[in-house]
A protein has these predicted regions:
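N-terminal Rossmann-like FAD-binding beta1-loop-alpha1 element of flavoenzymes
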Residues: 2-27
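Short beta-strand to alpha-helix junction loop
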Residues: 53, 60-63, 88-97, 139-158, ...
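Active-site substrate-recognition segment that forms the wall
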Residues: 16-20, 46, 76-80, 175, ...
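Conserved Rossmann-like nucleotide-cofactor binding loop
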Residues: 10, 33, 205
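Dinucleotide-binding Rossmann-like beta1-alpha1 core, especially the glycine-rich loop
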Residues: 44-124, 259-260
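Helical element adjacent to the flavin cofactor pocket in flavoenzyme catalytic cores
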Residues: 139-197, 205
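Hydrophobic anchor at the start of a short beta-strand
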Residues: 23-25, 112-113, 198
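Glycine-rich FAD pyrophosphate-binding loop
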Residues: 19-41
Length: 322
């Protein structure tokens, strides 16, 4: 028997991949449904990998994960927006920065990366001509894609269930069983589950689960972010993911995170954000006016204003410190 802890995108994805093999797999979730944590509250970016430092594990996994989602899309009929990403500069003085970004994309093996002329850019995204955005050049990253995170978790869990995986909801892990330094199972509020392998996919609580097994090699610090969901009636001017690399763009960026942008969804809502704030309380998913104001600094669509806000949600993600 193999046991997987929690049903976010990591837990559901791992369970579904393992269900290809003749294994007895149990997934334990303290909530009453899949994607109850950070996996339900994020902007659904399948990153191209250009933003990552070359040579790092993160850079490699960004690109490999992007390719993996293409397989999942075909196998699970996922709702995916193949939008690609355009990073636009408006002045010749910004060209060295754009070339540097292009070189990083090449080093990270990002497929299809290309520097475009103004004419090529407007042909690829006609909305830029309509809004009158000045363009000197642009970096085109065609592998950027957007998913609906909650729907993706549901699809993974449903397929895993068809393949024989058991999901136990409303089961909170209170301790991890060990014997001679090896994990042998977990103790939940509904009883003991024996398993020679336990996969820790507990998200922001993964360090707490690891500690139960005697592993205190790392700690996880919560980082929350606010995302503004715009009304579907306000159709985005740009169906593609567009970033204008202006001085205002760099000034508005949150110094604690590379994140924060303007993202269309497969259902064509526009998402603004997220912000990024480290918090000591892992249960803190509150939103403040400061967070809301920050999301508007991510807006580069002249046809969208704060009057189009439909909903706000907070996502508590995490950073690992070793």
């Amino acid at each position: 028997r193999q046991m997987c802890k929690e049903t976010g995108i990591s837990g559901c994805g791992t369970a579904r991949e393992l269900s290809r093999y003749p294994l007895d797999i149990v997934v334990v979730e303290k909530g009453d449904d899949v994607a109850a944590g950070a996996s339900r509250a994020n902007n659904g970016c399948i990153h191209h990998g250009q933003e990552c430092k070359p040579g790092t594990l993160k850079a490699r996994l960004n690109v490999e994960g992007n390719r993996g989602y293409r397989r999942w899309e075909k196998e699970l009929d996922l709702n995916v927006l193949d939008c690609g990403a355009l990073q636009i500069i408006q002045e010749e003085s910004q060209m060295p920065e754009l070339k540097k970004r292009y070189e990083v994309a090449l080093r990270n093996d990002v497929e299809g990366a290309k520097i475009l002329t103004p004419e090529e850019t407007r042909a690829l995204e006609p909305g830029l001509a309509k809004t009158g955005v000045p363009i000197y050049a642009a970096l085109w990253l065609p592998t950027q894609r957007q998913i609906e995170p909650y729907e993706t978790c549901v699809a993974l869990a449903e397929n895993a269930t068809v393949n024989g995986v058991t999901f136990l909801f409303g089961h909170n892990v209170g301790d991890v069983l060990t014997e001679d330094g090896k994990v042998t199972g977990v103790i939940t509020d509904h009883g003991i589950i024996k398993a020679p392998y336990v996969i820790n996919a507990a998200g922001v609580y993964a360090d707490d689960i690891a500690k139960m097994a005697g592993d205190q090699f790392y700690t996880i610090h919560g980082r929350k972010g606010t995302i503004a969901i715009m009304d579907k009636a306000k159709v985005p001017s740009y169906p593609r993911l567009v970033s204008q690399l202006t001085p205002e763009y760099h000034k508005g960026k949150n110094v604690e995170s590379k994140g924060g942008g303007m993202h269309p969804t497969p259902h064509m809502n526009l998402l603004l954000g997220p912000s990024a704030t480290e918090v000591p309380d892992k249960e803190d998913n509150s939103a403040t006016k400061k967070d809301l104001d920050y999301t508007m600094t991510c807006n580069q669509d002249p046809n969208v204003t704060s009057a189009a806000f439909a909903f706000l949600f907070e996502s508590l993600v995490y950073i690992i410190k070793i």
